[in-house]
Amino acid sequence: MLDQIKNSLIVSCQALPDEPLHSSFIMSKMALAAKQGGAKGIRANTKEDIIQIKEEVNLPVVGIVKRDYKDSEVFITATYKEIDELLESNCEMIAIDATTRNRPQDIKLQDLVDYTKRLNSEVELMADIATLEEAKIAEKLGFDCISTTLHGYTSNTSNHKIYDNDFSFLKNLLSEVKIPIIAEGNILTPEMFKRCIELGAHACVVGGAITRPQEITKRFIG
């Protein structure tokens, strides 16, 4: 998948249960619209959505399962259960929360990586990180790429945005980590997307700015 998405846009097609567009059918059509617009990949949540999206478009999919656990703040592909579901979906890449926070059931990140590779050595793994330290750890653990997904969404990075100081966080990752870096999170405009690619990001994931009409509407109203 990494070869297919080089210098390209990945559109995140997700709607949680409390959102108006929550529906596997609707997400499949959102993915089709994204493909027609030029997207080269899709990021999607849940086995059901991914299966329906793959029936609609022939784009590679980054799969996640968001699920809350009482004993952890980690909710993106947090345990073996989510890995099993994503492997059943046949997505090309699986994204896993790779922050240093404690995982549900005290599962170790290395064990989750090893488990996935043991069951399917072909599936690629994306590390959703918040800090440079986490990116370096993920690289050593055997992830295929890094995504800035959680930068600004953890207690130690709150109020940070990927675009701060002309994408200084992205620049630091690119200079310190050898595996591909995917820019994701608060990329709100075509200009931001182009800047990320210009700086050297392997690809860029955009979600809310394209696929969440309620957020787009709020931005217009201010």
Swiss-Prot record:
Its EC number is 5.1.3.9. CDD domains: NanE. GO terms for molecular function: N-acylglucosamine-6-phosphate 2-epimerase activity. Pathway: Amino-sugar metabolism; N-acetylneuraminate degradation; D-fructose 6-phosphate from N-acetylneuraminate: step 3/5. Signal peptide: none annotated. The keyword Cell membrane does not apply. InterPro entries: Aldolase_TIM, NanE, RibuloseP-bd_barrel. One of its GO terms (cellular component) is cytosol. It catalyses: an N-acyl-D-glucosamine 6-phosphate = an N-acyl-D-mannosamine 6-phosphate. GO terms for biological process: carbohydrate metabolic process; N-acetylmannosamine catabolic process; N-acetylneuraminate catabolic process. Keywords: Carbohydrate metabolism, Isomerase. Converts N-acetylmannosamine-6-phosphate (ManNAc-6-P) to N-acetylglucosamine-6-phosphate (GlcNAc-6-P). Belongs to the NanE family. NCBIfam families: PRK01130.1. This is Putative N-acetylmannosamine-6-phosphate 2-epimerase. It comes from Oceanobacillus iheyensis (strain DSM 14371 / CIP 107618 / JCM 11309 / KCTC 3954 / HTE831).
